[in-house]
């Protein structure tokens, strides 16, 4: 607050300054517009020689009309520049006049919430001669312009302000869920002062606001037809249409499954239901037969390998011989058997020839 007290907010004692000379207020000044119930009272002018005016941010040493420091000629010149509005300006300083600002803001809110107020663009707060700034928020996105004070009143769910009469009807705001956007969009807030008051200054500030006001109402139809459509409803429309399309597709599929073609004779309803049942049973029987045959093939193959292993003398004692070893040993044993058979066949031929020779010798000797 020490740094903020030396900043220029709304009033500058030099009336000939440039338009953009006034510095933008800090975040603390916006708390003064939130209808503070008991704002602090204005400090007395004669509080002390080292006191600093928080509204103007000027040290007592600077030339002020009526102050005890500075040159008298300069103070007279400044008193002429300020004119007769000097005392009223100090009283109307936005940093210290909370009650008057509260009453005016409540009056504007009650006018907007009146039952006869149109739903279109809300009327702007009229410029009052006492220098009360009117806030106007404009969103750079293609949307209708709305007053800055309107979302606050809507967030209160239509609570009555003290200035509202008992007979007036107040719109109750229905809070609707809006999709929160992670993208922050800049919102420009322009504070306009009273054009009749030469001491008021204009200043522009740009802030970043996250668009997740769940209590904001949808724009009126008249504004949406005249201006560009808002991105919010357009972005929500595909989400709403997507489940509708899914539901329609599911309904169509159910209708296709339920609705059958017109029956031709009395066999049509019977032919519809047995087909899926027969197809299912056929699949089950085929699967069962395939599994049975596969198990039988595996059992037969295993039994053949076990029998082959038993026929090979070298593997008869190996109960856990692999199939490759069984095949290789069986091949070697088979080749050995084939060689032995050929050898025995040659010996048999030789023995037969010897037999024939011996029979001829016996016949020759018996002839004598």
From Swiss-Prot:
The keyword Nucleus applies. GO terms for cellular component: chromosome; nucleoplasm. The keyword tRNA-binding does not apply. Residues 39-79, 112-179, 218-295 are annotated as: Disordered. Residues 135-147 have a biased composition (Polar residues). It is found in: Nucleus. This is Protein L-Myc. It comes from Mus musculus. The gene is Mycl.
């Amino acid at each position: 607050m020490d740094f903020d007290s030396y900043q220029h907010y709304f009033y500058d004692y030099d009336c000939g300054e440039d338009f953009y000379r006034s510095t933008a207020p800090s975040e603390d000044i916006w708390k003064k517009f939130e209808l503070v119930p008991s704002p602090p009272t204005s400090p007395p002018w004669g509080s002390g020689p080292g006191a600093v005016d928080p509204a103007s941010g000027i040290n007592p040493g600077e030339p002020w009309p009526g102050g005890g420091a500075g040159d008298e000629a300069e103070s007279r010149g400044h008193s002429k520049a300020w004119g007769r509005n000097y005392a009223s300006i100090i009283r109307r300083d936005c940093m210290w006049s909370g009650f008057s600002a509260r009453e005016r803001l409540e009056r504007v809110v009650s006018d907007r919430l009146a039952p006869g107020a149109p739903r279109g663009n809300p009327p702007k707060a009229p410029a009052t001669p006492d220098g009360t700034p009117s806030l106007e928020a404009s969103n750079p996105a293609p949307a209708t312009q709305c007053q800055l004070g309107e979302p606050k009143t809507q967030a209160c769910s239509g609570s009555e302000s003290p200035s509202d009469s008992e007979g007036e009807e107040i719109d109750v705001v229905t809070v609707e869920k809006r999709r929160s956007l992670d993208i922050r969009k800049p919102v420009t807030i322009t504070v306009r002062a009273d054009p009749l008051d030469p001491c008021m200054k204009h200043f522009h500030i740009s802030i970043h606001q996250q668009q997740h006001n769940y209590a904001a109402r949808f724009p009126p139809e008249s504004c949406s037809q005249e201006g560009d459509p808002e991105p919010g409803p357009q972005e929500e429309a595909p989400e709403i249409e997507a489940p509708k399309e899914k539901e329609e597709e599911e309904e169509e599929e159910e209708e296709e499954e339920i609705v059958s073609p017109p029956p031709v004779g009395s066999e049509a309803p019977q032919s519809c239901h047995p087909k899926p049942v027969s197809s299912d049973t056929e699949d089950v029987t085929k699967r069962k037969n395939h599994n049975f045959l596969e198990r039988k093939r595996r059992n037969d193959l295993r039994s053949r390998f076990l029998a082959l292993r038993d026929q090979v003398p070298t593997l008869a004692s190996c109960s856990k011989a692999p199939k490759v070893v069984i095949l290789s040993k069986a091949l070697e044993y088979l080749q050995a058997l084939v060689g032995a058979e050929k050898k025995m066949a040659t010996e048999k031929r030789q023995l037969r020839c010897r037999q024939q020779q011996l029979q001829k010798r016996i016949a020759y000797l018996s002839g004598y």
